[in-house]
């Protein structure tokens, strides 16, 4: 019996090693053999395959009885990560970091919130193009989007996007597709309207002096103090005509470039996507939307009941989460400028989203999120009245808060390209 068991173990190990070696050979061939790579690329699911899957998914969703659907409460949570100051966003089981570039005092650990929210809008738009093309029977071989902010103020973002598309459809069909995509994009429709954000402060008074064990690590209070010293030092150097030195203020990397440019371009969207600005593309194999800003990438996806794989938050969830992320970032800066010590800074957000929008009896129901509520949790040794004033200043200076509370103008155009893998 022992001999049989030993033989089985040896045989299993041999098969495992053989499979691993075969996979290594395939990987090496994919890396070194251009012909093999292009053959594999052409055998991968195409954009037209994605359109077929998307149409089936929409039809299956439409087959769900309206009475079986209910409004959804979107929940997101954002926190300022103590001594790093980065913003950590959690949406269901998904999470991501937002951070500033080096020249804005951050560590470039993630996309900055303004770029992230713009790319989230772009991702929702391009996803809407896919859905409407699938329903209209418009073939697409490649699709990508660039978007940029051209507006002059926090209240006026002036968003402009360019859709890069390879399609046999006529110009008039593509123009009709553009209009349908905008009409059915939740974030496009959300952004062109002004919304109220109901803000509630949950205040906790913390000790004036922190008394902690010797192993204590610097926290948010120390980060705010560091931000204050850095800001004051930079102001003095600017006033004297000198440029801030990266060796000062705790190693502040002011002289570093914003970040390295993105060198990667997806196979089916080619180099027309901007390497530096916010962009998005759809992965034909999974249908997931990939947001890209420089070398950072974040996924947006649909839940299973909408034909997705739930590999990331939805575009609507991302937008709500980014409101909290941006608020925490601006609150950090406001606290630093006003020399207000903070010990914790967390934001909890909810919004309502109704999947019945557009169905019979729900024609007037918005397809975008409504009833946005934001609870701001702050602990500080300063009195509550001072913290309430800080929250009000943060609202006025928060880019995404102003994006949400002011109606925006978004314009788009279509540019034809040729898919790289044809």
Language model region names:
Residues 2-20:
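Gram-negative bacterial Sec-dependent N-terminal signal peptides
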Residues 21-119, 131-321, 332-422:
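Extended beta-strand/beta-hairpin segments
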Residues 1-2, 25:
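Short, intrinsically disordered low-complexity segments
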Residues 120-126, 323-327:
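Alpha-helical metal-binding/catalytic segments enriched in His/Glu/Asp
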